[in-house]
């Protein structure tokens, strides 16, 4: 019997992460910025970046940042994510060889939206005309546990047998909009020990930057534009003028990371007393790693620096890879 072929998609408010095995059974990872713009009609000059779904036309990824803000789909709520989901799934299936190539598509939801699974499946089925059972929905954050216990802090195949893993760990999966936090005891997590918190992700940095730019320069920018400025360490170019917002980006990022540490203390303080580590995955891991030296005094108010574990590489792919591995186990 032929091995199933599964595509795993972690569609987030900041980026889209994909994982699958190619014809040589080698893991493939790919990432796109999730910016999505819906345009009224196709323009000849846009042919390379346009994607059509039904009678609608979209610009996806980095090219969408150049489209007027009024045409960009707002990605700061569940409704925005729901709107772009079928567009990206359709695009990715086409990109990777078509629906018939894959046995299943594994997708995930933040625990903050765990009651939205049926709504998402209804949307995908109605828009794409694909049966609901073609999709497998898995929990973000919680699924990262699978990769951690198999691969530790490095998802390279050669590094599977490392000794960085601990049995009692708080997993913090920080995305753009949400934080998913999972308390793992003796290698096991229960649904009662996991939470998802909306509007607690790195979008908090972007909110502050949007407010600062408007107050300082009288210029309105979108949350997605602010995200790009943060990703570019504060470099911002508008109408030929270059702005240096590196000081503000650093300040807002450090303030946000301190808030995350305080949130962990407030919600999991007693649990932390009996744990061996905090594992930080997702996009937030990049910021913790980048600002670790400046953040050390704040971290040590709660626990020693060694208490924090961060993947060596590809921290943003722990969910997508976890979806892939879990889906293969479910399909058999």
Kindly label every feature range from the protein language model.
Residues 1-169, 188-202, 227, 236-241, ...:
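Nucleotide/phosphate-binding catalytic cleft detector across ATP-hydrolyzing
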Residues 175-234:
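Aromatic-anchored, glycine/proline-accented short structural segments
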């Amino acid at each position: 019997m032929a091995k199933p072929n599964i595509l795993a998609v972690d569609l987030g408010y900041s980026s889209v992460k994909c994982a699958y095995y190619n014809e040589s059974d080698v893991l493939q990872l790919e990432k796109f910025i999730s910016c999505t713009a819906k345009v009224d009609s196709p323009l000849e000059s846009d042919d390379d970046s346009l994607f059509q779904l039904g009678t609608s036309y979209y610009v996806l990824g980095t090219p969408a940042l150049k489209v007027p803000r009024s045409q960009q789909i707002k990605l700061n709520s569940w409704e925005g994510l729901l709107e772009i989901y079928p567009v990206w799934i359709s695009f990715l299936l086409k990109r990777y060889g078509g629906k018939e190539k894959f046995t299943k598509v594994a997708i995930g939801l933040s625990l903050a939206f765990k009651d939205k699974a049926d709504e998402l499946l209804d949307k995908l089925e109605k828009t794409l005309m694909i049966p609901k059972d073609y999709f497998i929905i898995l929990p973000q954050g919680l699924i990262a546990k699978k990769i951690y216990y198999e691969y530790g802090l490095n998802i390279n195949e050669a590094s599977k047998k490392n000794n960085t893993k601990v049995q009692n760990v708080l997993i913090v999966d920080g995305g753009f909009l949400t934080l998913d936090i999972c308390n793992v005891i003796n290698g096991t997590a229960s649904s009662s020990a996991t939470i998802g918190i909306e509007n607690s992700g790195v979008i908090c940095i972007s909110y502050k930057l949007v407010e600062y730019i408007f107050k300082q320069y009288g210029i309105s920018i979108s949350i997605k534009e602010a995200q790009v400025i943060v990703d570019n360490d504060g470099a911002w170019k508008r109408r030929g003028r270059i702005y240096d917002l590196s000081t503000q980006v650093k300040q807002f990022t450090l303030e946000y990371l301190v808030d995350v540490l305080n949130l962990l203390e407030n919600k999991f303080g007693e649990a932390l007393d009996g744990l061996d580590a905090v594992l930080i995955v997702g996009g937030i891991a990049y910021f913790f790693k980048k600002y670790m030296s400046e953040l050390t005094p704040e971290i040590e108010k709660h626990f020693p620096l060694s208490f924090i574990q961060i993947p060596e590489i590809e921290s943003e792919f722990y969910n997508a890879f976890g979806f892939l591995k879990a889906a293969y186990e479910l399909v058999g």
